[in-house]
């Protein structure tokens, strides 16, 4: 064993001699020396847009949510704090447009649902004040259009509809709405509403079995007509048929360290972007084909700095850019798609 370490030390000294000799004496020895290194390629799918936004000084609170109006090139951001505007509006290029604070208590989730005829944004409000425990629709300039739930009063009722800490929603182009209600509140449920706000189906029981939830935190749809729910407390993603509400399966194997806090598909439907709050991590997961959802397979990850805490994210349907609301860093960052490969050490 002693002879082994002597050999290792000797090799190290010899290599150091070659480096110094080449550096100070211009020796060609090192230039002709071949290193045998094992390489693998790691797929890099996104890069940080360091220039977004142009005016980060408008982030004056804790940023909890972000939405993208791809049709009109707008980015909405919900932030919390005292005596600050709760909703900020930027362009996709990062220029600040306006802010508003009307009838918003404590924003948690936000979704832009604009059409050719209407610019609108939906907000889930988890505040305990007069405007809390509601899901609300606004115009782009902050005019209140619709209120779902009983403002200022939490509850479990379906008629009239009541919420307790509604986490997020997703609005289809048809106008149908999917709401995950229960960010640590009385409810743990997924509700589908029609465009005239009638309940079409729901799953609403706390637990660990199929179609049961423990903090349903985010919801999205894919092009195959499936509803994907980040079941954060159970450390899994559950999947349902959007028309019938039938449970189609769950992904349990990818999130054993930390449950998913946010889910969104890329515009081409190839990937599901998943945020994990306390790990400060974004995972790019291969989307399954039509049929069985199979097993979760992580293609790539974006590891953020400690305590950045990505809460909710959104994907631009046109450009594929990913916007991440970070409650630890108190900012929103933008990641741009990039199809490239870089070498990294590995076996």
UniProtKB/Swiss-Prot annotation:
Compartments, as annotated in UniProt = Secreted
BP GO annotations: proteasome-mediated ubiquitin-dependent protein catabolic process; protein polyubiquitination
**Which cysteines are disulphide-bonded?**
none
* Glycosylated position list: 32, 101, 206, 278
A Pfam family this chain is assigned to: NHL
Q: Name one GO cellular component term.
A: extracellular region
Keyword terms, alphabetized:
Glycoprotein, Repeat, Secreted, Signal
Q: Which residues form the signal peptide?
A: 1-25
Q: Where are the NHL repeats?
A: 47-93, 150-196, 200-243, 294-338
What terms describe the molecular function in GO for this protein? ubiquitin protein ligase activity
Query: From what superkingdom does this record's organism come?
Result: Eukaryota
Q: What is this protein called?
A: NHL repeat-containing protein 3
